[in-house]
Amino acid sequence: MLWKKSFPFSLGDSMKWVNHRIITTSIAFLLTQNIPFVLGAYAGSTLPDRLEAHKERSSLTYYNHRQVTHWFIPYMIAFIFLAILGFVINPFSEVSSLFFKVTLGGLFGCIAHIAEDAVTGTVPGLTLHSRIGKAFFKTGDNKEYAVSAICIVLTIITLIIIGISYPLQ
């Protein structure tokens, strides 16, 4: 099945890319207040869709959307492995720590993307052959933009509060 992305932000029945970026980045910031992690999350927020790009045609053409690149299990395994490696087993040097935080954020961004797609349709479940998710709203619907707006407002409020109490990490 061929899916075409309506440039520059939507992809078939998935959430629009701009909203993936806003929601994922806001959640990452609200959870961590860690800039390298947040930058990684921003980059990872559209990665599952980008990995499906058909290389021979264009970066806007996709085959079999929401299949293997939207399976959350590999991302979760890598995220948990890196988190245990980095925080419990072997704390990294300053440079390695920066790379680690960006990578961990990127994996978080991929996981968030998949969770966000699960509210506008289905994604692979525990196996590639099972599907989970429910379409609570359609792509581009006012509800999608309302969720993004709420994330922006919460992030601004958090920035104001933490800006007074302590600097960002």
Describe each PLM feature range.
Residues 1-169:
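N-terminal membrane-targeting hydrophobic helices
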